[in-house]
Amino acid sequence: MLPILLSFEGKKVAVFGCGSVGKRRAKKILKSGGIVDIYSKEFDEEIKKLKESNKNLNLIEIDINQLSDEELKNIIMKYDFIVTAINDEINKRIVKLAKELNKFVNSSTKTEGVNFIIPAYTEVDEVIFSIYTKGKSPLIAKHIRIFVENYLKSTDINMIAYIREFLKETIPKQKDREKILKKIFENEKFREELKKLIEKWENGNH
């Protein structure tokens, strides 16, 4: 697999199952602009409240066990992406049918046959970091995500971006700019002093 970033803006997504995993993945897709239909036997108050405040979320009450393969295919074919988060048996069935219809499919229990992953990720300022352990250790993925998130929060990304733009205007060679940025990034004291100067300049120009 190749890691990519994807906007779900305007994409139609079916989520089968409304347990903790199904809800979590549905929320991530909604945040990215996707149109999400959740298929489940029942829905809790949390997801019902979310539906009230989000026009891109629809809840369809249905028992997947009672559907034939043909009925499931008729549902799956309407969507761009499929997420199945019920149990291993049903997930395998949905993955198989989705693949037959050449759909992007994700499963909470099955990695074989799936062709898109929603990994653990964090976003701080303009930096997005994701980690995937191929389903072997979600706990490790979570701890790595938290570690990186804390590191990014302690690093002034906006300041580095500001300096980078300034260097582009004043230093023509990319290699020279890279050396300067590296020294700035590694020197905490210099970084703090530079941050104060930038803030002083910005305040004086507002």
From Swiss-Prot:
GO terms for biological process: siroheme biosynthetic process. It catalyses: precorrin-2 + NAD(+) = sirohydrochlorin + NADH + 2 H(+). It holds the Pfam family NAD_binding_7. It comes from the Archaea. NAD(+) binds at S20, V21, K41, E42, F43, D44, E45, E46. GO terms for molecular function: ferrochelatase activity; precorrin-2 dehydrogenase activity. Its EC number is 1.3.1.76. The keyword Lipoprotein does not apply. Pathway: Porphyrin-containing compound metabolism; siroheme biosynthesis; sirohydrochlorin from precorrin-2: step 1/1. The keyword Endoplasmic reticulum does not apply. Keywords: NAD, Oxidoreductase, Porphyrin biosynthesis. PANTHER family: SIROHEME BIOSYNTHESIS PROTEIN MET8. Belongs to the precorrin-2 dehydrogenase / sirohydrochlorin ferrochelatase family. Homodimer. This is Putative precorrin-2 dehydrogenase. It comes from Methanocaldococcus jannaschii (strain ATCC 43067 / DSM 2661 / JAL-1 / JCM 10045 / NBRC 100440).
